[in-house]
């Protein structure tokens, strides 16, 4: 009797990018998790976990693999051929962000115990280059705190089934930077800003009167119709190319009013039985 197929998430990426946070997020979501399992043991693990045991597993694979890291592409292909669903999540961050994090924790880089963190980062990027190219999704954690990263990972690997793509709608403020993980970025700063209406300045786009101020305009409705049409045009074509997860980011100046209202409305319009949509207001709580 053939063992049931398993959902296997391989978490990899740069040291200091948030792999520990990601594996804990999946553990909290019901995954059986192993940190630093030698990749050569993955086929044996799936064999030992046959039957109905550990149907959802998450593993960390990183530079601690050493010389065995080069075997990762071959091993992952072998496990996929066995019928298992294998997804690779690569966590990254800018060099400046990684250096700052190492400085804050006073840790040495694993690839440069006697050198600088910058030297270790450079060597690690080279070592992980092939694995990064295999990634089904790359998350840049440069601007994310641990709570944001946990929320993103859990949303990405939610067990809820969907026949179509999984979609993340994100509102953000340009003053805090464009989210690097976005596949599509749409600027809604052409719409009138509730910030300049005294009674709305301290509110957000989640408040009904603020949302109405943004949404009850002809140009807003035209914009939403065009964005929905664009998304529905793109989704099946992304799926055809093997991309099952999309992030659409909507930005205004501060990420509190216009983008929040538009993101909520877009989420409502795009959610159906074939598409799982996750809404995330990245900057709504920032000062």
Curated annotation (Swiss-Prot):
Amino-acid positions noted as binding GTP in the UniProt annotation, renumbered to this chain: 62-65
Binding residues for ATP: 13-20
Keyword annotations of the record: ATP-binding, GTP-binding, Nucleotide-binding
Pfam family, one: RapZ-like_N
InterPro entries (UniProt xref): P-loop_NTPase, RapZ-like, RapZ-like_N, RapZ_C
Keyword Calcium: no
GO MF term set: ATP binding; GTP binding
Tagged with keyword GTP-binding: yes
SUPFAM superfamilies: P-loop containing nucleoside triphosphate hydrolases (SSF52540)
Coiled coil ranges: none
NCBIfam families: PRK05416.1 (NF003828)
Function, in words: Displays ATPase and GTPase activities.
HAMAP family according to UniProt: RapZ_like (MF_00636)
Family the UniProt entry places it in: Belongs to the RapZ-like family.
Name of the protein: Nucleotide-binding protein MXAN_6564
Lineage, highest ranks first: Bacteria, Pseudomonadati, Myxococcota, Myxococcia, Myxococcales
